[in-house]
Amino acid sequence: TLFRSSLVDGDQVIDTYQQVFGVRTIRVDGARLFVNGEPVHLTGFGMHEDHQTIGKAHNDALMLRDAACLEWIGANSLRTSHYPYSERILDYADRHGLLVIDETPAVGINMGLGGGIFGAQGYPTFSAETINDKTQKVHAQVIRDLIARDKNHPSVIIWSIANEPESETEAAENYFLPLFDVARAA
């Protein structure tokens, strides 16, 4: 459905904004995902919106090439790995039935991952010197901003609030539980 709103002054149109809007239902039952009442098995990729010649700039031709690759492989979904993508990709996904896991740019919330891989000095992920209350407040606002921007895209079925974070500790639970609530409330 297309909604269009115009700001007018007398007979003169000052500005017009249009927004495509769609409705879908998402339900999880055990390990099964249902979209609009139908069971769905996600097949797809965590992708990156970048290219060696243009960097992170959006390019419609590259978007269409990526979409053709997704279709060729039989994928029905994509994850906006590590950061939000251009709204153009979400518009494309809305029109073509792709399901999207929309991710915040919260990468590196796992000090053990880098330290374990590179043998570096181990630091706790959550502490006054690393990931802390200030980080959590900014992270919460990033979640609100992402959901405010993308909530009308029916292709978005999951909000991913972090990429590969520390998740097995009590400190991680204390950090992330309030952020889950932020996402649910947004």
Predicted regions and their residues:
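Short, small-residue-biased leader/transition segments that mark boundaries at the very start
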Residues: 1-2
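A generic structural signal for well-ordered alpha-helical segments
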Residues: 93, 183-184
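Short, acidic/small-residue loops that bind anionic groups at enzyme active sites
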Residues: 112, 185-186
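Active-site-adjacent substrate/metal-binding segments within catalytic domains
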Residues: 6-122, 128-176
